[in-house]
Amino acid sequence: MRMWGTAGTGARRLRSVGAGVVVWGAVAFGLASPSGASSAPTPVTQASTSSRGVSATTINVVFPLISFTSIEGQFEIESDAEYGEQTKAIHLFVDQINDAGGINGRKINPMIVSFDPTNVDEQRALCKQWTQGNPPVFAVLDGLGTWEGVNELCVTREGHTPMLAQWSTTTNWTDLGAPYLWWTGADDAPILAATVSWGVSSGRLGHGKKVGVVVSDQASDQDALNSYLMPDLKKVGIVPQVVTIAGAVDETAATDSDATLAVERLKAAGVQSVIPLLPDNAFTPYLGAETSQDYFPKLLLSDYQSEIEIALGLIPVPYEKALNGQQGVTAETLGGIDLPRPESQGGYDPGVRSCWTVWHKAYPQTPKGNINDDIEEQGPVQGWCQEIHLFAKAATMAGKDLNRRTFVEAMSRITDFPGGYSPVLSYGPDKFSGPTQYRVVEVHDNHPPTSLCKRGPATQPPAGVCWVVEQNWKPLPSS
């Protein structure tokens, strides 16, 4: 749906990950901070048998949306017309399920709830209302990854309510939320392991290279470093130089100063390859410091904190030299285009194509500001489509006796589900994140136009930037 030439092919909507809010909330709400040494997840066989939110004819399901009147909501709508289509998308795909007979005779009752992502107290109150108040709620679905961090744990760990969520971090988070928290986004633990493996095989790590890690001081990033990345590097005999940057969103001056010092240290040490573990509010100052000091090491980007996605939006300005040509690991279908052409030609994968077919039939007209009615390959419409159909699959498998235990047991049996952001989703009794594969992509500035970026409609100009697939799908390492 986006205008070709103004964005990269297959671009997804981006938003910051509130690492600082995640950690603050975990402490304030009495939850354990994430730790790689967390206790084993609660088995699905020990889930609650409560059927709260389920009646003889309906299933109450919450769909949280960032308020369109909030600052972030207004920004998203201005930058992406499809973002404003979310309510239509939710009703369309819920109606598709209900009109086909529902789930074992029950209809999904969609409860679409707007929230301000900057209002922590409001989010906490909403969570408690859903999990303890009226009307009762059976499940929460988040197709875009906006109900993030500790909010996931409020619903699942505290509220014992099933949640399907696109926002993800490392394995310890689903351990805390088990057996109710199920991610459609990739677990970052195997993503980091894949980053190290690819780094070694591509010559970016090892082979005499000096390696650095730039990480924020936020507890979630420190845990990713110490519990996951450092052990992965140790296995291949790499001892990196680690530099830390302030990562809280309200520490702008400290972040800028730390970024400058971090680059000075890495440059002075002759570091050639850098693995960033940074939220975007620290990632961009770090790139600015690289640029101002004319220091451009190889960056090993990844889905961690959405760095590989964010990077595409930062070229050709302001960080062309720092990012153009950099590569990274992703479990998402980056590198395709927003067209219902064959997948082999860069078009929709089967899951997204099925979503587009339903959307196109209902809304064949071209939305204002777009050139066609094609949905974004990584956009809001397919995100909600994926989450709703995955929920319906598990709820149907749970049978007539739908309760929390039968639902999560059904989720643990789902394999090879056609995904949206990722091609395939597979789960298990102790596998709470669906993606199973990763690819390596390059951030590419397409000025002047080249054949590296897949073309959209022939009548439209080529994309200005794109992800170029450098290595296609391989299995993610076991987490």
Task: Annotate each predicted stretch with a short phrase.
Residues 27-47:
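C-terminal region of N-terminal signal peptides and the immediate post-cleavage residues
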Residues 43-48, 52, 324, 412-479:
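Solvent-exposed, acidic/polar segments of extracytosolic/periplasmic ligand-binding ectodomains
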Residues 47, 84, 99-178, 184-185, ...:
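Beta-alpha junction/loop-to-helix N-cap segments that form part of ligand/metal-binding clefts
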